């Protein structure tokens, strides 16, 4: 892992460009190990919609759009979560959201009729897709009470 080990490695500089002499580039600490960043420079990632840079940017935008993600009380849905899918409900004064995480390399289908949390007076199923964090071009599909979520993705339902 980059930034692990000795202290100097934890201060490795960001690769702003592939050009080592570009404005903003620095060498880092003299005692830092030579490292090659896994995801490339910012300049390379900015125009790639599937880059780690854009994934983090989208993650922050969704967190800012839905404060309940950061502030909400968590309820784990044991009824529909398993080894590859995690479903949680976040609740606070700002509202309520359901977050679905697919940690597998294949699309998964979640049946909300099996939810351990169930519907509440103000939380009826089916829900609506409010946001997605995708790692590819395939989108999530909500069909009545079943959600098909692409590999390595997160879906926010409201």
Task: Indicate residue ranges for each PLM-predicted region.
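C-terminal beta-strand-rich structural cap/linker in extracellular carbohydrate-active enzymes
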Residues: 139-158
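Loop/helix patches that line or flank the sugar-binding groove of alpha-linked glycan CAZymes
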Residues: 1-109, 117-118
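Short helix/strand-capping connector loops at secondary-structure junctions
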Residues: 35-37, 133-138
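Beta-strand-rich binding/interaction modules
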Residues: 69, 107-135
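A short acidic, often aromatic-flanked loop/helix-cap motif at beta-alpha or helix-coil junctions
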Residues: 21-22, 135-138, 154
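A generic, residue-level signal for flexible/boundary positions that often mark functional hotspots
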Residues: 8, 63, 136, 141-143
């Amino acid at each position: 892992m980059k930034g692990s080990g000795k202290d100097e490695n934890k201060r490795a500089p960001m690769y702003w460009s592939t050009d080592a002499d570009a404005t903003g580039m620095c060498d880092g600490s003299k005692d830092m190990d030579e490292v090659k960043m896994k995801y490339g420079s910012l300049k390379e990632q900015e125009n790639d919609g599937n880059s780690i840079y854009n994934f983090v940017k989208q993650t922050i935008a969704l967190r800012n759009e839905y404060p309940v993600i950061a502030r909400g009380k968590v309820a784990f849905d044991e009824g529909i979560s398993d080894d590859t899918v995690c479903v949680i409900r976040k609740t606070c004064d700002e509202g309520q959201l359901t977050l679905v995480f697919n940690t597998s390399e294949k699309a998964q289908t979640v049946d909300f009729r099996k939810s351990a949390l169930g519907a509440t007076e103000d939380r009826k199923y089916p829900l609506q897709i409010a946001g997605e964090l995708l790692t590819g071009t395939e989108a999530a599909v909500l069909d009545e009470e079943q959600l098909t979520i692409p590999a390595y993705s997160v879906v926010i339902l409201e």
